[in-house]
């Protein structure tokens, strides 16, 4: 049930009937204050200006023509021409009843699209670190949200699995006479990488051999391919442990590494030349873009093939977009990559559009994000200044949550305690990130993220346990609630209306890739339920009808909190 969309349609019809153009915008919004109704239509002023009318006069005409019979109990004009809409409580009650039993909480089915979501993208032969966290969990929240709405979502884990580093690793493994890479853990590989890089920088003979292995690998040499495959498999097996701990939906089947596009690169360079988009410049192949200027004000040159024949990330990203449209059949392509890559992506996509590889009708969207910072406002590091490994961060989260939860639950069975601690610890790290606007940097703070009050995972998880505890105490389940829902008290109406706004929220998150909007909604919902619970008797209500009615509101609150948190990849618990 998308009330905003319903009211927008009704107000638009009335505006058009009053003489507005067919493309007019009703600008229906949720009201910020109860005195202005549940919704407010703000589009009259802009339309009145176009029509040369007084806004108030047009608003009066729109209200005359606005048919909200059975939906609104009152419609008012405020100020110069705002239209305030107060929802009918009987209508609200009926819609809550529907949401309780309907699939997906009454969220309307969408026209399914094939949507490719590019996220996580760790590098082979390196452990995941905190720098991978934002892409991984924000991207996964988008995937979960889009899938919930009914879209065909293709997860694309653009793993860094190609390049000169593999020549170094294979050469160094050989040098160390440790060719059986399957016996190594990833920590060994990371150390090997560091030592290989040091040797590569200091030993010219070794560097030549490493470069030779790169050529052999690229030409399909069986030995090099086997070693490369082992390195990839070991890395992704370790990464899967992190994904599982994070409750992220990525699996090995979602890996679409850089190597996937290798065969396409020569064809793309040849095609861009044939189309007159790419030219030779000092031995390299370059695309000059008028849309981007260098410091001299001339079109910027984007290299797609070096003079030694090597390709660049831009070439791979062009191939990647082409593949996602032509082979995967994408209707929409989303990239969860940090903001520092924005110009690089825009240049690649400009070439993609000019070449006709992806039509304008298929959006290419960079859902960029800022950095995770320490309390000092600098990039989050270990005390010694090193990069924080993701596994270490998650270990600490669980350890800290353990102290918090064990103190409060001395009698909880060990298995349940372990599950709760894990859900709270991992949830705290994820929610702290997801609750911030992804476009901004944010401060990583253990105390804030594990707090049992405020907009945190522990608070939200505890709020959920409070709601479900009502049913344990009442000794009822959904099937025993047979009496109709009635909404009479203001707090009942406020909670019920907010519950019905779930579809508006999840639609916004799906459109804009902004999970913090869901976090804000759930936090608000938890607060409204708390107020309702304190002021409206549930178990000791004055009549059985009111008791069952309020239990139904509590039931939909529990379902909405659980579903909302699930779209964020946050696990709920029954006790805490």
Curated annotation (Swiss-Prot):
The keyword Membrane does not apply. It catalyses: tRNA(Arg) + L-arginine + ATP = L-arginyl-tRNA(Arg) + AMP + diphosphate. Belongs to the class-I aminoacyl-tRNA synthetase family. GO terms for molecular function: arginine-tRNA ligase activity; ATP binding. Keywords: Aminoacyl-tRNA synthetase, ATP-binding, Cytoplasm, Ligase, Nucleotide-binding, Protein biosynthesis. This is Arginine--tRNA ligase. A motif ('HIGH' region) lies at residues 124-132. It is found in: Cytoplasm.
